[in-house]
């Protein structure tokens, strides 16, 4: 759906965990580690938590903080409201408004006509798949997300059986794997998680869609129309087919 649960969860797991119950461990790592890369990103079909460091001790510490955040986050209801959405009243005579880190972020994203166009194109080409929805969250739908749905999403999908863990660089892979197993993976049983993505079926005829985007009331409407044509290609593993386009 368009409620942005994966995006809100990406923010929320980095707001304290079992071993690191501080408010924002992500910011603490940015300030106090030797990291060369530290981030988290939500895509329509996955969420990534990459870390990098050229210092071995620091790298293991980064791994520990991130693994604990992913598999054992606190994700309290207060965190959900902070990172997702909540009601806010600035003054008694003002209207109640919606606020939230992800809610505000996506309002900014949806203020760009290019972003709106790009998203509607993907959603129109793949309506029956996860790519047909706004993984970051549509501000008009984010406020429908409940704390229970938020928690259930983590319980269902944030499991080692539904993950891919990659190491890259000149390091001792066996040492990394032993750390993973001894500190985290040994505590989980292998389970079956249904997260496969089915291919979008071809359309019987071309689809046409008119969408709208906002402009300020003082802004001219001249030369503000966009036209885009999109094609659904074969799987990306069919290199010749994709290269032809």
What are these regions (language model features)?
Residues 54-58, 169-174:
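Helix N-cap motif at beta-to-alpha junctions
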Residues 3-15, 245:
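Active-site recognition of the HExxH zinc-binding catalytic motif
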Residues 1, 19-57, 92-96, 100, ...:
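Non-catalytic beta-strand/loop surface segments
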Residues 6, 23, 27, 60-63, ...:
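Extracytoplasmic/secreted envelope proteins and their assembly/folding machinery
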Residues 16, 51-98:
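M16/insulysin-pitrilysin zinc metalloprotease superfamily fold
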Residues 11-16, 65-73, 105, 109, ...:
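Structured segments of extracytoplasmic/periplasmic soluble domains
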């Amino acid at each position: 759906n368009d409620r942005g649960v994966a995006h809100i969860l990406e923010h929320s797991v980095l707001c304290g965990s079992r071993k690191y119950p501080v408010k924002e461990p992500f910011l603490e790592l940015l300030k106090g580690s030797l990291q060369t890369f530290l981030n988290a990103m939500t895509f329509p079909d996955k969420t990534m938590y990459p870390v990098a460091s050229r210092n071995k001790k620091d790298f293991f510490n980064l791994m520990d903080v991130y693994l604990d955040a992913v598999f054992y986050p606190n994700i309290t209801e207060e965190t959900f409201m902070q990172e997702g959405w909540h009601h806010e009243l600035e003054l008694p005579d003002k209207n109640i408004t919606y606020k939230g880190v992800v809610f505000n972020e996506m309002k900014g994203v949806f203020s760009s006509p290019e972003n709106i166009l790009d998203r509607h194109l993907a959603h129109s080409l793949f309506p029956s798949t996860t790519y047909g929805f706004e993984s970051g969250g549509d501000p008009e739908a984010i406020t429908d997300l409940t704390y229970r749905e938020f928690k259930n999403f983590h319980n269902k999908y944030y499991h080692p059986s539904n993950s891919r863990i990659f190491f890259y660089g000149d390091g001792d892979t066996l040492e990394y794997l032993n750390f993973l197993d001894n500190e985290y993976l040994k505590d989980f049983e292998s389970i079956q998680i249904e997260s496969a993505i089915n291919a979008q079926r071809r359309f019987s005829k071309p689809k046409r869609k008119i969408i709208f985007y906002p402009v300020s009331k003082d802004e001219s409407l001249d030369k503000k129309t966009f036209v885009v044509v999109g094609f659904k290609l074969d799987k990306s593993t069919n290199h010749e087919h994709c290269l032809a386009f």
